[in-house]
A protein has these predicted regions:
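Acidic, glycine/proline-rich low-complexity segments that act as flexible tails and inter-domain linkers
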Residues: 1-91
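General beta-strand structural signal in soluble alpha/beta enzymes
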Residues: 110-114, 135-138, 153-155, 177-181, ...
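Conserved small/polar residues in nucleotide/adenosyl-binding loops
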Residues: 225-234
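Gly/Ser/Thr-rich active-site loops/lids in small-molecule metabolic enzymes
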Residues: 196-213
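Hydrophobic alpha-helical segments, chiefly the membrane-spanning helices
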Residues: 236-242
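Short glycine/serine/threonine-rich phosphate/pyrophosphate-binding segments
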Residues: 88-100, 120-122, 163, 189, ...
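A glycine-rich phosphate/pyrophosphate-binding beta-strand-loop-alpha-helix module
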Residues: 44, 93-149
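Phosphate/diphosphate-binding glycine-rich loops and adjacent basic-rich segments that engage nucleotide
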Residues: 141-198
Length: 242
């Protein structure tokens, strides 16, 4: 298999994007731990230096979902995920978690996917843990929480066990890779709706384009500007087919 991946590395080093199928295959191989660490690191660095395309991000997201612990919710629940990419470096308030809890209190079914803090004062998991929330570890617990309260939080490490093979490589590289932006797109519950916040206009565009080819009913990608100008503070991108 590594011979095929070496060809993908050459493709990336030549500045050529991978197809969605190639990206999904690469993701599954990385998650299986079947790629030599040096080659895995080289592939991730080459992809980052080239710049991820929407097809590549979508392929990685689809592959990551396939190896995740499946959380199949009843269609009648029509859950929404309210999530942000993080990465703005502003050390700001965790907006997505507050919005998710408020939405659940207003009657929506929220299946929120997230992790601990990377760039903000507190990640979704940090905040919920401080409030005394207990993370579900199985799909049935997620279903029960949503039916009882309208809210459940899928703590990423509990539902993406295969990522243990990727974690050491990411830690060794110490640079941003495609995995830094996959979190919002890899909810194992496969929500019908998304409200996604991005840290830059480029990221908002990439996320919108990536979501437009995924199985969901509707998504809204938003970007908040903190300029003092009263005009154009908030911009949004709507995926054309989502």
């Amino acid at each position: 298999m590594n011979h095929g991946l070496e060809r993908l590395l050459g493709q990336l080093m030549n500045g050529e994007s991978l197809s969605e199928e190639q990206s999904e295959t690469l993701m599954i191989a990385l998650a299986a731990g079947s790629v030599e660490p040096a080659l895995a690191g080289a592939l991730l660095v080459a992809l980052s230096m080239k710049g991820e395309s929407a097809e590549e991000v979508r392929g990685f997201a689809n592959g990551m979902r396939k190896v995740a612990t499946e959380v199949k919710l009843d269609d009648s629940l029509e859950p929404i995920d309210i999530v942000g990419t993080g990465g703005d470096g502003s050390q700001s308030f965790n907006i997505s978690t507050g919005s998710a809890l408020l939405s659940a209190a207003c009657g929506l079914n929220v299946a929120k996917h997230g992790n601990r803090s990377v760039s903000s004062k507190s990640g979704s998991a940090d905040l919920l843990e401080f409030l005394g929330y207990r993370f579900p570890t199985e799909a049935d617990a997620v279903k029960t929480q949503i039916r009882k309260t309208g809210f459940s939080f899928l703590f990423a490490p509990n539902f993406h066990p295969a990522m243990k093979h990727v974690a050491p490589i990411r830690q060794a590289l110490k640079i941003r890779t495609v995995f830094n932006i996959l979190g919002p797109l890899t909810n194992p519950a496969k929500p019908s709706f998304y409200l996604l916040g991005a840290f830059s206009s480029e990221m908002a565009s990439l996320m919108a384009s990536s979501l437009s080819g995924m199985e969901l009913k509707r998504a809204f990608v938003c970007l908040l500007y903190t300029s003092p100008s009263p005009r154009d503070r908030t911009r949004s991108r709507m995926p054309s087919s989502a």
